[in-house]
Swiss-Prot record:
UniProt GO BP: acute-phase response; glucose homeostasis; hepatocyte proliferation; interleukin-6-mediated signaling pathway; liver regeneration; positive regulation of cell population proliferation; positive regulation of estradiol secretion; positive regulation of receptor signaling pathway via JAK-STAT
Stretch list, region Disordered: 156-175
Modification type Phosphoserine: residues: S81
Organism: Sus scrofa
Domain of life: Eukaryota
Record's GO cellular component terms: extracellular space; interleukin-6 receptor complex
Pfam families: IL6
Record keywords: Acute phase, Cytokine, Disulfide bond, Growth factor, Phosphoprotein, Secreted, Signal
Binding partners and assembly: Component of a hexamer of two molecules each of IL6, IL6R and IL6ST; first binds to IL6R to associate with the signaling subunit IL6ST. Interacts with IL6R (via the N-terminal ectodomain); this interaction may be affected by IL6R-binding with SORL1, hence decreasing IL6 cis signaling. Interacts with SORL1 (via the N-terminal ectodomain); this interaction leads to IL6 internalization and lysosomal degradation. May form a trimeric complex with the soluble SORL1 ectodomain and soluble IL6R receptor; this interaction might stabilize circulating IL6, hence promoting IL6 trans signaling.
Protein name: Interleukin-6
GO molecular function: cytokine activity; growth factor activity; interleukin-6 receptor binding
């Protein structure tokens, strides 16, 4: 079967497909062929096949790129905002040497754990985007749902799929309070910072996945 380009999916169709995938706990291709026909089967197989992790990450990166472009065009929040972003003290997940994802000191199990945990930590920031992002809401929804699907996929690759930590609800509540902005300018600055940070995290993750 020919592979399908993720750019061809609409956010709504893609999101529905991922929800079905997650609800059925990653069924086998044979099961999928029994459940649906034609393109619907192909769409679901794209995200249940173990070798499609890269495509899923690329899909998310494409949506992030589209959102950043929207922010740039609508609010002029472009690359010239780096100085402002550097001063922002949000505690966004980042890759470090100890995480085992860099070529020097690479450790597959440690790296998988860090990627999974980091993506879980990003969920609260994506909740914020769902609430505050005012442009194409479909892109935000697609990023959040596909990120959750990526978490499930990566957990299956690790030796301890349930070991990834879940942020404390109290911590999340405090973080949401911290994210609340007093003005439109700061809100948009936080949105672009979250998008940039998630993009960087996924770029590091993609490079690590390629050498696993």
């Amino acid at each position: 079967m020919n592979s399908l380009s993720t750019s061809a999916f609409s956010p709504v169709a893609f999101s529905l497909g991922l929800l079905l995938v997650m609800a059925t706990a990653f069924p086998t291709p044979e099961r999928l062929e029994e459940d649906a026909k034609g393109d619907a089967t192909s769409d679901k197989m794209l995200f249940t096949s173990p070798d499609k992790t890269e495509e899923l990450i690329k899909y998310i990166l494409g949506k992030i790129s589209a959102m950043r472009k929207e922010m740039c065009e609508k609010y002029e929040k472009c690359e010239n905002s780096k100085e402002v972003l550097a001063e922002n003290n949000l505690n966004l997940p980042k890759m470090a040497e100890k995480d085992g994802c860099f070529q020097s000191g690479f450790n597959q199990e440690t790296c998988l754990m860090r990627i999974t945990t980091g993506l879980v930590e990003f969920q609260i920031y994506l909740d914020y985007l769902q609430k505050e992002y005012e442009s194409n809401k479909g892109n935000v929804e697609a990023v959040q749902i596909s990120t959750k699907a990526l978490i499930q996929t990566l957990r299956q690759k690790g030796k301890n799929p349930d070991k990834a930590t879940t942020p404390n609800p109290t911590t999340n509540a405090g973080l949401l309070d911290k994210l609340q902005s007093q003005n439109e300018w700061m809100k948009n600055t936080k949105i672009i910072l979250i998008l940039r940070s998630l993009e960087d995290f996924l770029q590091f993750s993609l490079r690590a996945i390629r050498i696993m």
